Amino acid sequence: MVPPPTEEVLPRIPASASALIWDRRGRLLILNPTYKGGWALPGGVIEADGETPWEACRRETREECDLDVQRGRLVCVDFLRPRPNRPGGMRFLFDCGPFDGDALSRIVLQEEEISQFRLVGVEKALHKLSGPIRRRVAAAVQHPRGLTYLEDGQPVRGPMDDRS
């Protein structure tokens, strides 16, 4: 018997990537999508054609608000288990650093997907963002120099976390 092709056997895990974009005053860029409730970060689905999380972050940010992200540091990875109302998958969050006011004043929204944007303080952003995104942003802000791994939005402790 001939085994099935690898692509038919291996699981497919949906993935997306988002960007933390700040202004020089420490305010976070949030977007109001037209296709779902609540506010979100620039970002979206990673294409199945071999696109990397970083490439998706850059592409989606350019598509949604016409910002060209040049640098980014991975700050959070969240594994979401499938649920009845959600397929699950991997979520990557990149801190793309501060943008100057000139770049942010020239934001052009993709009107079919994004109705408005705001630059808000972290606390206000955490209040406006949906639960899963809020938990990723909170984890990234709490550990500004590290990489946080979450499962279903919750921190996972491992043996290395107990080091002194």
Where do the protein language model's features map onto the residues?
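Acidic, metal-coordinating catalytic segment for phosphate/diphosphate chemistry
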Residues: 1-18, 24
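Residue-level preference for beta-strand/loop junctions
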Residues: 13, 37, 88-90
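Small-residue-enriched segments and motifs
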Residues: 17-19, 69-72
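Conserved beta-strand and immediately adjacent loop positions that scaffold enzyme active sites
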Residues: 18, 27, 116
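Nudix hydrolase/Nudix homology domain
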Residues: 37-39, 111-164
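Unchanged
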Residues: 46-70, 79-132
